[in-house]
From Swiss-Prot:
It comes from Penicillium fellutanum. SUPFAM superfamilies: MFS general substrate transporter. The chain crosses the membrane at residues 34-54, 116-136, 155-175, 189-209, 231-251, 266-286, 299-319, 370-390. Glycans are attached at residues 12, 110. InterPro entries: MFS_Str1/Tri12-like, MFS_trans_sf. Disulfide bonds: none annotated. This is MFS-type transporter phqF. GO terms for cellular component: plasma membrane. Its main location: membrane.
Length: 411
């Protein structure tokens, strides 16, 4: 084990930037302001948790309301940073993330599933006010007012954003339609994939040409710790979100549970997330904050979060295609009396109200087999996270001071 800066400098520059020298002293924040800022941040995480846990339990009822099993994947959201001193703020946010898994079931069963969205409005308003009023740069105690409005506007990377949105839209729509609504060789699906490739190529070119001003700076993407963290985060979160979305379908379609019962039965998964599994979700943020200079941490953290959100949307759409294709295949194999179109329009809840008793057992078995095979895909995606994990540098989160400069401890 070596504790000198020379070990840090011997690493390739594209792999690990040198640790910052003379790190800025953080300016303190009054406890009452910190408390309100934590409360606003926790509300923001709570809103994200609502999108995931509420919608996962309400989606079977939503598919029944709109007579469309094809829309399972649309509910996917289209979160957390800490350093050594941030565990105290991260723990309550992680706990809040899983506290209300049954709320969506209660809304869907006793009120209306639309409240799954309405509830975000007041919470989002409170969050916005608190963050705007109390957030400041911990290094200087103020926001950066020296930057002109034009430079701030350029920093938004508007051209990249305008290209990225249709790129992701075409990919998601192609994955949702392919093999389900239309065959994979259908012209609509092919055109969507072609647009995705062309627009994606243009977006990559813009990111490369803008260099550090890009939304995703190429310099950071080439850093092994950043792309490894992004791969790990995308796979592990994508796998978890598939399980979170399809367990309620199994609970309601196979076990015949109500939305509230579904929210209760999924609590062991949520409790496991709070107690231990959530620990793995924080590893990429620890990695980039340990390996990179302080000036690069915000952008690198945003890249990891971007990979997380993108994987949620893409992998849920892919899982929907797998689920629906396998469901139709099992239904055709088990019973010739069931029309697949009738299965789509019935939705994933209250199957006994749509099908007779002589075909219902076959449909339930088909649902169970289709959900199980979707979980196989989630397991494979989780295994792919090791690709990112094994490429991370072996660094210690502890830092020592050498001649006033921060030095990384290599293991």
């Amino acid at each position: 084990m070596h504790n000198t800066q020379s070990d840090t400098k011997c690493e390739n520059a594209s792999d690990t930037p040198e640790s910052p020298t003379g790190e800025e002293e953080s300016v303190g924040l009054a406890r009452w302001k910190l408390g309100l800022l934590m409360f606003g941040n926790t509300l923001a995480v709570f809103c994200v948790a609502l999108d995931n846990t509420i919608m996962s339990n309400a989606i079977p009822r939503v598919t029944q309301t709109f007579d469309s099993l094809e829309d399972i994947g649309w509910g996917s959201p289209a979160r957390r940073h800490f350093d050594r001193q941030r565990e105290r703020t991260t723990s309550p946010k992680t706990a809040v993330y899983g506290c209300f898994g049954g709320i969506g079931g209660a809304f869907a069963e006793n009120s209306t599933w639309r409240w799954c969205f309405y509830i975000n409005l007041p919470l989002g308003a409170v969050t916005t006010v608190l963050i705007l009023c109390f957030f400041f740069d911990s290094r200087t105690g103020t926001s950066d007012v020296s930057m002109s409005s034009w430079n701030r506007f350029r920093g938004l990377d508007i051209p990249g954003l305008l290209l990225f949105l249709p790129t992701v839209f075409c990919l998601l729509l192609a994955l949702q339609w392919g093999g389900a609504k239309y065959p994979w060789n259908n012209v609509r699906v092919i055109v969507l994939f072609v647009i995705f490739i062309l627009a994606g190529g243009c977006w990559i070119f813009i990111q490369h040409s803008m260099k550090d001003q890009a939304s995703v700076p190429p310099r950071l993407i080439r850093n092994r710790n950043v792309w490894s963290s992004a791969v790990y985060m995308g796979c592990i979160v994508g796998s978890f979100i598939i399980i979170l979305y399809y367990f309620p379908i199994w609970f309601q379609a196979v076990k015949g549970g109500s939305p509230i019962q579904s929210g209760t039965m999924i609590l062991p998964i949520i409790i496991g997330l709070i107690v231990w599994l959530g620990f793995g979700f924080q590893l990429p943020f620890i990695a980039v904050q340990t390996a990179l200079p302080r000036s690069d941490i915000p952008v690198a953290t945003a890249i990891v979060t971007f990979a997380q959100n993108l994987s949620e949307a893409v992998l849920v759409a892919l899982a929907q295609t797998i689920f629906q294709n396998r469901l139709f295949a099992h239904v055709k194999q088990l019973s010739t009396l069931v029309d697949p179109n009738a299965l789509v329009h019935a939705g994933a809840a209250n199957l006994d109200q749509h099908f007779s008793a002589d075909v219902l057992p076959e449909i339930v078995r088909a649902y169970s087999a289709a959900v199980t095979e979707t979980f196989y895909a989630a397991t494979g995606i989780a295994a792919l996270s090791f690709i990112g994990l094994i490429r991370l540098q072996w660094l210690s989160v502890k830092k020592t001071k050498t001649n006033g400069n921060a030095a990384q401890t290599h293991l």
